[in-house]
Amino acid sequence: DLDVGEMYTKTELFFERNKKAFSIAAVGLVAVVAGLLGYRKFVAEPRAESAQEAIWKAQYYFEIDSLDLAINGDGSYPGFLDVASSYGSTPAGELANFYLGVCYHQKGEFETALNYYKEADLDDDVLRVMAEGNQGDALVELGRADEALAHFEKAANMVRSDHTTPMFLMKAGILYTENFSLDGGTATL
């Protein structure tokens, strides 16, 4: 038989005996939450804004096909390498890694491109899928068809899209039929 009064008294005694520990835990929790909020407001957000301001000129050089200037900067403005190394954990820093992958891919430096595609941890669904699929493209160029196939299939299934899903399924199918067996290629499509 459960006595509510006795149970209440035991609970009350437990809290009374451990009041100091509960107070320390509560203060610690408040300090951690305040620290996280402060870090976000006073460190992470300003850093993300600085990164966004730093990347624009490199993006411009990329758009006009000046890959070396996009990668290394022009002396007055940083290139993607500087943005990625200085602001790597920000959205603009992650985007710089993606751009570096594309730049090195276009320059024919496929292993370097592959490394930067892997580094790009992007929030945007389309860019995340493209980074995955572009890894497959770089692996094809490096003659690693089996690894490329896995990346194409992963990219095709990451986010359903009228653009990226059929594109990467087609790449997977073509790669499969050229390097493996026709039956598997048909099954992939």
Report residues per predicted region:
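N-terminal positive-inside, membrane-proximal cytosolic segments immediately preceding the first
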Residues: 1-28
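Short solvent-exposed coil/turn linkers within tandem alpha-helical repeat scaffolds
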Residues: 21, 45, 84-93, 107, ...
